């Protein structure tokens, strides 16, 4: 017996959906991408459209109401109009638009919409949009970082919907709960206790971040430092030279017209120091990098290093760093200054007594630093960065306790039930504030490690983040951001993004949502539900390996709040569905078999869960060059996905091409990035 068709099985306003999905990638304020980094997120517009059109009947399902093709087309156009409004970012929480969309879902499901499960929840777009449309959302993932992202998106905010801020500043300005919708009160408290953390951290370690003296010709006085620009160094391979050779890939600081600046290496015998020069950088000083990887020219003698030589010295822990320039907050923009003794001494601090650590995988595809002796995640941070991050992390528990005490003072029930146990009283609220503060620190690590570059863009000179690509590359000249400045890469900037997400993007709803750590290959017990998911793409992204960078810091801050979730030292990897040969002694065949078997078991579980009258939707991202150029066959990942779906008992009833990435973003420029998705 054939089932009545849903809209997604017949027609979609694809151009409108793709236009909104593509536009969304450039939206920053309030978007989930600003809550916490996750790789290859699906656009909210696409997820919203797919869920809604999978639930709403196509007019052809009701010939008694729409007996002619003309009548069906007219009704279809009416539904398209609802969907075209629904996918717009500006309408994400528009009550009229959402009410119209939800009414159609109820009409097509006899007022009994199904729960939705995403077994590979990842960045949380699909569960969030299910919640927005009034569904009971279930988000499962094996990765604790992904689990926390989903908790922060769909589980925690509804629990404290409409909560008035509890902090003392807000209490003096408020009269009742009027005006605080959704998670806006929670956002206000995250901002307040984040400011307290910043002040307290500066009281403890602010002396490590002195202001820089500004010469008279640049305005005089002192300036807050935005960033320190460093170069890694090794001893020159020429025995007659032996200088500490800077491994700088660029000496350009600013390309802004009329404000160009660069770093000039000054050699005196076998010593090198640096002076900042204003004006356009001469071509011969743009870079001393002369080949791929670690091939550099010595400024003293002209000797060229080999990649093997630098790796050898790195593994022997004989690689150093030298300060090349200081970036300050000027009265009219950035000012660039030569390093001085005070700034160099301030950075020379011992490592803190304890800090998060964990071994990086020996997988050069995604991790370059281990080849140069940086084998632990802690090796990716300077001692000053470790000191700042551990200080911030230690303050999360203190801020959490203050928020709990203030919540009790405002009358929030003091039931002592933990957030992880489903609590919604004062203790749970304090812990909820702590979760978002911990997210701010996690985001800060992406801008406060020695893999961050100085982006000398013509329009904006800023500290770049470590994950410009879906990998951790080796960086030779790096920017150390001042976490207490007013520039980018600060804790307060990260918390500002988080608070905007809570205020803008979180739906104002009370839909039940459940997030748990779960292996997609196991039976979770759900039945007669809707399933929509964005599974891993064979070997494209090593989620578990990459997320360890964040996990070690998140665990430091939240292991007492979610002890079960953070019981392991690193992210679980044995069951992760990624075809990674290095986990199988380099065997591509074993990696392929592992992925194929795992994906088949997953699809078999999904088949058990799915409600017969609602199509299962699966995203498969691809690049147009995603073919084997030698055999001219489709990629192994695509074949594996189709095989698993069909062998599990499904029939593919339709496919839709959806734009899900910006083609010009950094990771797609010359790399095997995922440009579009096919929705099955």
Regions found by a protein language model. Name each.
Residues 2-117, 127, 131-528, 536, ...:
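Nucleic-acid modification enzymes, centered on SAM-dependent nucleic-acid methyltransferases
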Residues 120:
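Conserved glycine-centered beta->alpha loop in an early N-terminal alpha/beta scaffold
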Residues 123:
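Conserved SAM/SAH-binding loop
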Residues 590-596:
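Short, glycine-rich nucleotide/cofactor-binding loops
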Residues 596-614, 643, 647:
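A short glycine-rich, Lys/Arg-flanked "PGG" loop and its adjoining helix->strand segment in the class I
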Residues 614-620:
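Short beta-strand segments at enzyme active-site cores
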């Amino acid at each position: 017996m054939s089932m009545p068709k849903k809209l997604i099985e017949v027609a979609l306003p694809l151009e409108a959906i793709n236009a909104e999905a593509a536009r969304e990638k450039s939206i920053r304020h309030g978007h989930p991408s600003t809550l916490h980094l996750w790789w290859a997120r699906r656009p909210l517009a696409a997820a919203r459209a797919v869920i809604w059109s999978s639930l709403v009947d196509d007019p052809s399902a009701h010939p008694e109401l729409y007996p002619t093709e003309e009548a069906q087309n007219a009704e279809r156009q009416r539904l398209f109009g609802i969907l075209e409004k629904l996918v717009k970012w500006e309408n994400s929480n528009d009550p009229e638009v959402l009410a119209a969309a939800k009414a159609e879902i109820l009409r097509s499901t006899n007022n009994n919409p199904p729960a939705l499960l995403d077994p590979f929840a990842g960045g949380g777009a699909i569960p969030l949009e299910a919640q927005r449309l009034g569904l009971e959302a279930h988000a499962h993932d094996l990765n604790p970082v992904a689990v926390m992202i989903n908790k922060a998106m769909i589980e925690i905010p509804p629990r404290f919907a409409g909560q008035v801020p509890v902090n003392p500043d807000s209490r003096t300005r408020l009269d009742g709960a009027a005006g605080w919708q959704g998670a806006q009160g929670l956002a206000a408290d995250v901002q307040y206790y984040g400011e307290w953390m910043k002040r307290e951290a500066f009281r403890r370690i602010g002396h490590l971040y002195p202001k820089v003296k500004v010469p008279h010709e640049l305005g005089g006085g002192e300036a807050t430092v935005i960033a320190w620009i460093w170069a890694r160094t090794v001893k020159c391979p020429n025995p007659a030279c032996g200088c500490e050779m800077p491994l700088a890939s660029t000496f350009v600081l600013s390309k802004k017209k009329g404000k160009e600046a660069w770093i000039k290496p000054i050699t005196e015998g076998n010593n090198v120091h640096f002076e900042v020069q204003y004006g356009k950088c001469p071509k011969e000083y743009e870079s001393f990098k002369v080949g791929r990887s670690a091939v550099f020219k010595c400024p003293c003698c002209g000797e060229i290093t080999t990649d093997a030589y630098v790796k050898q010295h790195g593994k022997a822990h004989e690689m150093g760093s030298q300060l090349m320039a200081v970036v300050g907050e000027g009265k009219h923009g950035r000012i660039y200054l030569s390093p001085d003794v005070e700034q160099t001494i301030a950075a020379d601090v011992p490592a803190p007594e304890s800090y998060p650590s964990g071994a990086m995988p020996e997988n050069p595809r995604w991790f370059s630093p281990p080849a140069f002796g940086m084998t632990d995640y802690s090796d990716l941070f300077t001692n000053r960065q470790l000191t700042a991050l551990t200080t911030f992390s230690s303050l999360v528990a203190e801020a959490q306790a203050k928020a709990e005490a203030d919540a009790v003072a405002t009358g929030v029930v003091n039931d002592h039930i933990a957030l992880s146990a489903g609590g919604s009283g004062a203790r749970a609220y304090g812990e909820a504030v702590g979760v978002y503060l911990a997210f701010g620190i996690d985001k800060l690590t992406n801008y406060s490690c020695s893999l961050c570059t100085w982006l000398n863009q013509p329009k904006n000179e800023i500290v770049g983040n470590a994950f410009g690509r879906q990998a951790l590359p080796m960086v030779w000249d790096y920017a150390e951001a001042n976490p207490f400045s007013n520039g980018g890469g600060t804790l307060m900037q990260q918390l500002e993004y988080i608070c905007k997400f809570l205020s803008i993007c979180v739906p104002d709803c009370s839909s039940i949502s459940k997030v748990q750590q779960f292996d997609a290959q196991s039976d979770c017990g759900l039945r007669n539900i809707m399933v929509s998911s964005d599974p891993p793409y064979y070997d494209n992204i090593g989620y578990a390996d990459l997320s360890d960078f964040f996990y070690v810091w998140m665990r430091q801050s939240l292991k007492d709040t979610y002890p079960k979730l953070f019981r392991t030292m690193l992210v679980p990897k044995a069951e992760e569905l990624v075809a990674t040969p290095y986990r199988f002694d380099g065997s591509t065949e074993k990696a392929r078999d592992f992925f194929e078997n795992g994906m088949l078991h997953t699809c078999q579980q999904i088949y058990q869960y799915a409600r017969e009258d609602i199509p299962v939707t699966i995203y498969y991202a691809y690049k147009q060059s995603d073919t084997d150029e030698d055999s001219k066959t489709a990629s192994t990942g695509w074949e594996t996905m189709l095989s698993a779906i069909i062998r599990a008992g499904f029939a593919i009833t339709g496919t839709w091409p959806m734009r899900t990435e910006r083609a010009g973003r950094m990771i797609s420029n010359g790399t095997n990035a995922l440009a579009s998705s096919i929705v099955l």
